[in-house]
Amino acid sequence: MKFIIEYGCDGIGSEWLAIEAENLEKAEHYAYLSAFDYRDGYEGLHGVQNFAEFCEENELNEDYDESWEAYNIMIEEEIFYHVYEFDEEDELHLEVLEESEGRFFVV
């Protein structure tokens, strides 16, 4: 199946990509992971905190599992992703496909 995905992080922006996946669930999983990777690329920049900065700001000990859990919750709240079935009549979908050199990235 063919999809258009958008993924990103609050306060930074987003990316769009044309993908082909076996089903909607796999497309959603890929978009979710892409959002995490996108955010990770900005850690320490534009106000995106890394784990040490998060712990310092929230006065948490970096050695506790609870600190990691709180950090992961923060990340989940910052990232976003959307998956749309490809519609060849949708201008935005066609633009995304064109930016992908007319190809769907197989996931």
Positions of PLM-derived features:
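A short, exposed loop/beta-hairpin motif centered on an aromatic-Gly-Thr core
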Residues: 13-24
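Short, mixed-charge low-complexity intrinsically disordered segments
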Residues: 36-107
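N-terminal cationic leader/targeting segments used for protein routing and processing
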Residues: 3, 24-27, 59
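A short, charged, amphipathic alpha-helix used as a generic interaction element across diverse proteins
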Residues: 23-42
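Residues marking helix boundaries in flexible regions
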Residues: 5, 20, 74-76
